[in-house]
Amino acid sequence: MAVALGAVALAGVLSAGPLGAQRCRQPHYRWAQKIDTSLATLAPQPASAVAILGTWEPPHLGAQDRCAPRAGRELQVYSVTGWVRRVDKVKEDGDWHIELTERADSPVDSCIVVEIPALRYSPRYGRARATLDSLIAGRTIRRGGALHRPVRAGITGAAFFDGQHRRGGRRSDESDGEHGRCNTSVRALWEIHPVYEVTRP
């Protein structure tokens, strides 16, 4: 009996390590937060690309925070109207990556990123993608997804800080330069993600 109890106790100790190490099993950085629809019914607050890049303070999140829950501003929904400058529909995680600027003639690196997850995660995302497709229909799209002529769009969705692209830890002021064409400031890591609705202004 003592041997059996000892074996059970040992098994518990051995299993505790892997379970603790496997608490974060998301397939991509903060994936549950990126596809979540629980905030979709909140009333959106107005925002702009200029305000996001100039006034939204970055949270203390970095690449190591792979499963960090939403907090602070990320618990709010925002509506942004801007000009679609680039659309990338071929991302590893299946999201559509869209770059939005304040004006049609704004520098392309003054963009914010908004992302629409795949239809399989919610019909909302399918509708948002369909509306975006209708907005860019007939536009010339260059290699890499850049639109020859920008198109105006309204975007509604949850704020999200993509700390995966932060260079140097949770308090760094630089990104790794891999966040699309948007500038390398940490504030440019703020996204609207997921996008719940796309509208024609």
Model-derived regions: residue spans:
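Aromatic-residue detector
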Residues: 1-2, 97
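Bacterial N-terminal signal peptides
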Residues: 2-16
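OB-fold and OB-like single-stranded nucleic-acid-recognition modules
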Residues: 20-201
